[in-house]
A protein has these predicted regions:
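Surface-exposed short loop/turn segments
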Residues: 20-42, 107-158
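A structural "domain/chain start" motif
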Residues: 20-93, 204-228
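Envelope-exposed proteins and targeting segments
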Residues: 51-53, 67-69, 76, 84, ...
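Extracytoplasmic/secreted envelope proteins and their assembly/folding machinery
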Residues: 93, 97-101, 107, 187-194, ...
Length: 228
């Protein structure tokens, strides 16, 4: 009987140790990193508040391999990989879309800036394709240089007529080969690209507004009755 109890005790302890092993891991927990929109100064000139148009930012497209929550990196010999233990809070195109909307709204040069889910109509549509959003190790240094490139098309809502295209980019070298430094370089490169996007989008729409001035608003009806 004592022998059976001893065997049962050993079995319980073994099962407990096995179960404990199932719920413990030596792997570091995955870290989520985010980027902030740049503080864009309000440019001089531009469109007057009354003439300021509205803009909708369509859901961005991305080159193959980039639309993911992974922080992507490029290595020699045309290899693409990603950092383990790190992720963006959303797929990259969703994050870029939010940053574009925040940047354009903060400029104060638009009557309204809406994302792709807005139910309200807009005067212009901005379509962005992300060509690069990666940490580039192909130059041979110990730390990467982050590259961001955005291909932009602006069109009128009416008739879907394209009125301008441009490419903006930004690059920033990471101070060291450490995730915190690499994420900081991602933010610097993205800030440069978004700041340029804001300026060029405004220039394209301002030029279109000058070529096609809108009809002035109709005068408001007077509430006064004619004198008898």
């Amino acid at each position: 009987m004592k022998h059976c109890l001893r065997l049962l005790t050993c079995l319980v302890l073994a099962l407990g140790a096995a179960c404990t092993g199932l719920f413990t891991s030596n792997e570091r927990p995955e870290q989520t990193y985010y980027l902030r929109a740049p503080a864009v100064p309000t440019p001089e000139g531009g469109l007057s508040p009354k003439a300021a148009p509205s803009l909708r930012v369509a859901r961005p497209f991305a080159d193959p391999g980039l639309d993911t929550t992974h922080l992507m990196l490029l290595e020699p010999d045309h290899r693409m990989s990603f950092y383990t233990g790190a992720r963006w809070p959303a797929p990259m195109t969703e994050m870029v879309s939010a940053l574009v909307v925040q940047t354009l709204r903060a400029s104060g040069q638009w009557r309204s800036v809406a994302d792709s889910g807005s139910p309200f109509p807009s005067d212009y549509l901005l379509q962005v394709t992300v060509r690069r959003f990666d940490a580039d190790y192909t130059q041979g240094g110990p730390a990467p240089t982050v590259q961001v490139a955005l291909d932009c098309v602006i069109g009128r809502r009416d008739g879907r007529e394209v009125i301008g295209t441009f490419v903006v980019s930004g690059s920033a070298a990471a101070g060291e080969n450490r995730l915190g430094a690499v994420v900081g370089a991602f933010e610097q490169a993205t800030d440069a690209a978004l700041t340029a996007l804001g300026s060029q989008a405004l220039a394209v729409v301002s030029a279109d507004a000058a070529r096609h001035p809108q009809n002035p608003p109709s005068p408001e009806a007077s509430s006064q009755r004619p004198s008898q």
